[in-house]
Amino acid sequence: PTITATAAEALAAGDTIAIKTNGQVEKVKNTSSLVNPVTGSMGLINNSQAWYNAMNAYDATSDKMVSVVNKGSGSGNLRLWFGTKGSGDTLTWNDDITTNLNTTTPQGHSICWLGSAGKFLLVWAEGSTRAAARVVTVDYDAPSVSLGSKLDLISTGECGRVDVEAAGTNKAVAIARKNSSDTLYAFALSVSDTTVSESTTTVATNVENQINNIRINADNNAGIITYTTNANLIARAFTYNGSAITLVGSNENLTTHETSYNSLVYAKDNKFVAFWRHNNNYGVAVVITYDSSNTSISHGSDVIVDTNISQNALAYDSNGDKVITVYRDQGNNSGRITVCPLTISGSTMSVGTKVGLNSTAQSIPRQRAAVYVGTWNGSYGSCSVSSSYHIYDLQIKSSVAGSTNDKYIGFVGSAVSSGGTATVQVVGNTNSNQSSLS
């Protein structure tokens, strides 16, 4: 059966149709309502001892949040925990897996999901000897982890400041700094079963021992690497073809002042956002624009988010179109966790309302402390809290996603302009006694 109704917007042949309360019809669409100001909370995961440098990744197939943490006084091995979302916004964590993911004191680590249930790629700097990568497979039911063979990315010399980003199923891009030569390397990583292979590119020399980041736009495999040299934060563009990284253009100097803790996220429309601590302790963010159709990148003017920060992380709320800053707020309780949304407009951003999530000093979010999960309607993760370095989770709400799918009635067979009369092919049963939409 078919019905006719006024189109509330231009419709194309085959569009799925929802009916509005005024009797007009429109495309079924996702909706989003902003949570303003943002809300959030933190819950204790583990306080049995000190835990450091929590890095997080989301397994979309298994619907689990995974955290890799450094056990004990900054010199212990890496452990993996996972969180399951229950009713409401809270996560229930399993922190009982005691398998060490590495064998030597880590100087830095990062993790990404490889696109299938329980399968992750861990990259870490192993003591004074190497930077390495391996597949980590999680059995959530047991629970247990199994470890793939270790691949040396840098086989000799002390390394630090690593990062890794998923780039498709069983694909990733990573970076690691070799301390003895102050050289930053990038790696295109491919996984077959649990075996990792790599292709190496030299990014830069004279790289300082600060946080480095790598992020990629999965729509066009164009990415950004950020690192620090001569006290300035640098952005470098690259393209990725599935097996190799190619550097593009020249360095983009994001700062004219000394920086320290920094983070990076891809948002949308070829826009990345970098966030860092200024040498005057300000929290500063900029929009970086880069796509793979040209050889240059650009960045907008500095946006001051807060006046006294240190460690920080970024997540992108794709439903609410907000960049979420998560940072140690040195101006409140000597380091509580504060979150603040940023709205991108062209090459700049507007700053939303800042909200504190706790009242505890020395809260330390690392650059992958939070991950936005659309199906959970929020950004989730974990970080160390207090001088005892206990681990707490993060739960941040900046928008609520919805859909007009509950108003779905069928589809249109031909295009119609806004205000025109649409003929809708109704799917399902109809009421033969109803002669119109009124």
Model-inferred region functions:
Residues P1-K64, V69-K71, L80-G86, Q107-H109, ...:
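Extracellular receptor-binding modules and their adjoining Ser/Thr/Gly/Asp/Asn-rich linkers
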Residues P37-N46, N94-L101, G148-I154, E198-A204, ...:
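A short beta-strand motif characteristic of beta-propeller blades
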Residues D89-L91, S144-V145, V196, I245, ...:
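Residue-level signal for glycine
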